[in-house]
């Protein structure tokens, strides 16, 4: 089964907790702190595998969670860092943040890797907090929580040339005779319901990939027929072969077909009309095809002024293989002259994550619940909160000093907080002391 979209959740591993421990050995008086740091949590990494052709693996397996780092140990030993969770994806997978819609990465090269969720760093053990004033601290940190996010995956197959046209104009037949692909062929509409891919090799030795897409009909951009759901697979192509049934066997005007399909491509709004098109006049072995072709050329010329270059038209027959060699040579020549079209501006993509905080990032926010409790939130504040070991009094006092240093106390006073008011961070509540 072909699946080209999927929504999944990924959770990187938490960092391991730091340890509070002291050196206790015979003949070693005042051994001092000896608690080690926790290990790093595992990342969730997408790896491109050219052997995959669909996102089917994500249909039933939608949750991916990396292991957490090990806790710090005595004797100053660090916990082991967790292994990264490596998830295989097919070439041509676009990864978006499901919440913001932002493109995180576009994975097109075999072996390409991208970290979609970063593991948390390990918490520090008490050996890290020793100072001349406090040589035996009972302070440690919890591990940093791993990144958690929901992702939208879209597969856009890698092809140099895309075949577009109404249903039953001969796209699948053409693909079957110019490549070794074996698409389903039938004398009814929408025989092709998933994209098919094949490799062409011309007589001159050049090769390129061709994608046969399910047929479009008028109104596809509004969801008629199969809609435009498969047009994402033409986004990576550099040349479009516009297949037209010149026999008019369906009772439609070939030129009206040409206009209708171009309108649907334009409605898709992904600069598809900027790609060079070759008009393929198919079924030239049928009666009246030549007459219809002449009429088509006349109407096409009437809609172009004398200074515009008319699109190239190649009469062929997929059934008798008439004109195929000329068409393929012209397509290969056009491909050589056509650069790749960038789907996304790399400056808009998420950079590899870094650790730390932006200087301009707001450290905390203050709000008030209906029960008059002050509520503190904010990414920086919550990170400090989550890494505080509330089982140790010294760690709690350290967190209080950090809040004071961030200006939380002054901000609460400015908002009208009074001695004894309740303050909540997450599920933790404490009294404000003025």
UniProtKB/Swiss-Prot annotation:
The record's top EC class is hydrolase
Every OCT domain range? 356-434
- Outline the subunit composition: Monomer.
Binding residues for Mg(2+): 172, 192
Where's the Obg domain? 1-158
Annotated GO MF terms: GTP binding; GTPase activity; magnesium ion binding
Name used for this protein in its record: GTPase Obg
Among its keywords, does the record have ATP-binding? no
Which keywords label this protein? Cytoplasm, GTP-binding, Hydrolase, Magnesium, Metal-binding, Nucleotide-binding
Signal peptide boundaries:
none
Q: Which GO terms describe its cellular component?
A: cytoplasm
Report the sequence similarity comment from the record. Belongs to the TRAFAC class OBG-HflX-like GTPase superfamily. OBG GTPase family.
The coenzyme or cofactor needed here is: Mg(2+)
Q: Which gene encodes it?
A: obg
| Cellular compartments annotated | Cytoplasm
What does this chain do?
A: An essential GTPase which binds GTP, GDP and possibly (p)ppGpp with moderate affinity, with high nucleotide exchange rates and a fairly low GTP hydrolysis rate. Plays a role in control of the cell cycle, stress response, ribosome biogenesis and in those bacteria that undergo differentiation, in morphogenesis control.
Residues recorded as binding GTP, renumbered to this chain, are 165-172, 190-194, 212-215, 282-285, 317-319
Q: Name one GO biological process term.
A: ribosome biogenesis
Enzyme Commission identifier(s): 3.6.5.-
Q: Where is the OBG-type G domain?
A: 159-336
